Amino acid sequence: MTSKYDALLHNQSTNTNPFSKLQDRSSLLGEKFTKVLVANRSEIAIRVFRTAHELSMHTVAIYSYEDRLSMHRQKADESYPIGKVGQYSPVGAYLAIDEIVSIAKRTGANLVHPGYGFLSENAEFARKVNEAGMQFVGPSPEVIDSLGDKTKARAIAIRCGVPVVPGTPGPVEHYEEAEAFVKEYGLPVIIKAAMGGGGRGMRVVRSADTLKESFERARSEALASFGDGTVFIERFLDKPKHIEIQLMADKAGNVIHLHERDCSVQRRHQKVVEIAPAKDLDPKIRQALYDDAIKIAKEVKYCNAGTAEFLLDQKGRHYFIEINPRIQVEHTITEEITGVDIVSAQLHVAAGFTLPEIGLTQDKISTRGFAIQCRVTTEDPNNGFAPDIGKIEVYRSAGGNGVRLDGANGFAGSVITPHYDSMLVKCTCHDATYEYTRRKMIRSLIEFRVRGVKTNIPFVLRLLMHDTFIQGNCWTTFIDDTPELFQLYRSRNRAQKLLAYLGDLAVNGSSIKGQNGEPALKSEIVMPVLLDSTGNQIDVSHPSEKGWRKLLLDNGPAAFAKAVRNHKRGLIMDTTWRDAHQSLLATRVRTIDLVNIAPYTSHALASAYSLEMWGGATFDVSMRFLHECPWDRLRRLRKLVPNIPFQMLLRGANGLCYSSLPDNVIYFFCEQAKKNGIDIFRVFDALNDVNNLSLGIDAAKRAGGVVEATMCYSGDMLNPKKKYNLDYYVNLVDKMVEMGIHILGIKDMAGVMKPKAARLLISAIREKHPELPIHVHTHDSAGTAVASMAAALEAGADVVDVATDSMSGLTSQPSFGAVLASVDGTDKQLEFDNNQLREIDSYWAQMRLLYSPFESEIKGTDSDVYNHEIPGGQLTNLKFQATSLGLGTQWAETKKAYIEANKLLGDIIKVTPTSKVVGDLAQFMVQNKLSAEDVENRATTLDFPASVLDFFQGLMGQPYGGFPEPLRTNVLKGRRQPLTDRPGKFLPAADFDAIRKLLSEKFGVSSDCDIAAYTQFPGVFEEYRQFVDRYGDLTTVPTKFFLSRPEMNEEMHVEIDQGKTLIVKFVALGPLNPRTGQREVYFELNGENRHVTVEDKKAAIETVTRPRADPGNPGHVAAPMSGTIVEIRVKEGAKVKKGDIIAVLSAMKMEIVISAPHSGVLKSLAVVQGDSVNGGDLCAVLEHE
């Protein structure tokens, strides 16, 4: 310390208040400089306040009306509004020179620090501050005049012999001058604002067609940002580096440098990531840059902090760009590597200290390690970096050794407006080497949690991990030249998304379709305890090693089928994981409850032929209503139960759908199903159409699966008057055997196969095909399924279907325990431990209570099924649908209409999707009070359900015996052309590459399984992904909390990953905001307070929102981001060409054009000048000419 500085320290006054002791001392800058006003906002204002407080100075903040809640106002000792409410625009307030000078004078400020941006390079402001008797913290007004104007700075550099980029000799006032320069020097060129920085007022022009528009936009943006629309033009260098030298000078003429920064990583001329010092810069070039920077500073008698900026071309030649006569955003990295507090030096120099007096001489300035600064902003990289606005719901920052944060409005509850720069915080990391620093920055950015607004963190992480950045070889257009940078890492945001779902549940209740009330189960679920034959408890943390699947994997499908046929005892397939809950609980059982019982099932059911657990309705219901990924369910269960074969239901050429799909979709789907864990494909066709069956059989076979070709059983085979007799079924089996199937399935979906019929049919097939394994499936709607399955086993069937007792009976499968008892002591005795089955069943008894909101109203068996033949799964759904349509009191009429509809359609096989056709027609008849005769007589004029039209057209295949005429012709008349062959033949092959591209653009990287799901259910898949984007993956949320409104102060434990559990407590529900129709919902998350804003769907909303543009409507023109409409270019009714500018939007001090997406006529404008809009709001409607 010098003697002058020591004297100040020794003259400090004493104050007994420890909290004000630091500031109650005299300022370290002397008695003349005790108070500083910062003529700026946000982060840089707080940065100056902090150093000023360390120097025992008092601080003054100023703020606009829009900034009245900004953090910088609270960090100062005093804060004052700029003008009256409405007097200035949000930006204009910080450009109000006279008002700011008046506040500074009135509050007794001695120093005025301009920060960066706004008035920091305005000579008039500096002059007025000095004239008012205060000291401007920065260069003199004359120096600002000479260097702040880039055209004057160029002239100075040329005078000093410092190389500059070829450009206009002075400011360009008129477009004609710009045009003349381009003609002389060629393209590309860059148009730059003469004043200011930060990339604003800059436009690169590569085409003569865009020169005029770019010129006008640069001038307009410069005027809006800096109060001066002057611009100049330079040649644009290709792929240069941007190197800047930090300068510090005093009034005595001392000038030093604080080494360099590499600011090459930019987007639209705005710096994104800065590095100090520059990596691998040639020492000779580095020294030349230092020398030239100091040369210019001395030439103009520079004082205070400043930055000399240079471009370095690919041949190592450097060109002077400008000197920024102010502190820079990125000054932090220089402070980190040099240990110099630049703001402190600024204040000292402004107070009259020389650099040597504060210990700053060139020989004492050295660098230590590397520093990197990243700007965390609320910009959305997926939307052209449009700034996002809204309330920050969660804010958690990084920390640790070598991590520095400079921020302001980054806190939970902060409202990000469209009025100012989008930066939340500057994260600066410092370490011994460039690579250590880079890794530290990555770690720090990953630690950040910002929810409620989008941020650029995913983009910056992608940038930091790019090879070019790792090598330190970036150039100024690197971001624009590297499209792979926009393949972003998606933040999962799991906790906040979970709270959003629970908040919606608290306000609006469950949104799961078909739910009636809340679960009856209120207690904790009790898990089974399995004991082995010796009474010891089985360790279920490891799956059983017993089971049929090992034989299948080791020897293949043919050997597996042979082993099944040679097995002397009976085998079962358990349907609890699919058809049972489809029949009883509307297919609503969730993955988590299957996962919980899976380890126990692996042991207790190790002897099972298979578990039916996938395909059919479970696939689309899991996405559509449970918001789960069916592929994830398959993979998770496969991992837990590797020993028992998994079986799925495949609707032949329909895949999982109700109508035919392109052939390549079926093959692709089966391939993915086999890869992810399916072993046995139970392939059927709803009409027993062998053409449709053959495709599914071939697809399953090519995928490497066990082909269980299945014929659908319907009617009463014992009645000679019925259409489907014994000969029909045996002939059908013959055709399937010829296709090379492994196993025969018989699917009695309505449960109408009587025990005698089972004996007769199985015996006939067994006699003709003694080596063919037979598997029989039924439903217990009539109450005779146990007897039928026992009869089937007795007659020679190898496998029958059962469901655990608590999930059996009625429209489900027969009881496991009852079938087990029925064949006990016979040759077909089943090999299971009764005690273990009871333990498994006790779990499912609890599940029945947990899913009680989805129970059907069917309370007993219905022998009338032998008449109406409604399939078990449909019987439940049809009654629910009838009630939904207001036909609940006409259930008997609906069943009667089902019989009539079936006859009208030609007495068809009834299984999804043909059963839906019969059901739709039946409800149509009841709703419209139509008899069968009415349907026949009025067929040409009735508006039939779409499924009925699909059936008669032939989209579901060809029914046995053909279509009923003339009904078919009359139904289709003037509507559709009938098909006479397999529908899939007429469908074009799916373009998987195009689908992958589409899904990747919409939802990020997409897998083969995503494509397979999309090709089956495109709309359902998109809705599912949109739900997950909004609420996250909810599969691990316990079902009790998934279906029920959260209880106040009840703890919810949700394991979102291995070893990572969220503890959530619902603590309060806020009042309704009548203006927005929303409520605040408050939670504790792992002990921290969190809240979410939820729309109350029952509330009336007072406000009227702007219409939103429909992304699927090519005529809708949307606002690309939030901001204010500053200019309307065309009138309604005008003709426009593609790319013509319709309006200009101003946001975050940037101007963005809204252009026509195609040529046409402007039908209407939805905005006027001055309107505030959000991104995606409708601005205009175009019509094609």
Swiss-Prot record:
SMART domains: Biotin_carb_C. GO terms for biological process: generation of precursor metabolites and energy; gluconeogenesis; pyruvate metabolic process. Signal peptide: none annotated. It catalyses: hydrogencarbonate + pyruvate + ATP = oxaloacetate + ADP + phosphate + H(+). Pathway: Carbohydrate biosynthesis; gluconeogenesis. It is found in: Cytoplasm. GO terms for cellular component: cytosol. The modification N6-carboxylysine is found at K747. Residues 32-484 form the Biotin carboxylation domain. Pyruvate carboxylase catalyzes a 2-step reaction, involving the ATP-dependent carboxylation of the covalently attached biotin in the first step and the transfer of the carboxyl group to pyruvate in the second. This is Pyruvate carboxylase. The lineage of its organism: Eukaryota, Fungi, Dikarya, Ascomycota, Taphrinomycotina.
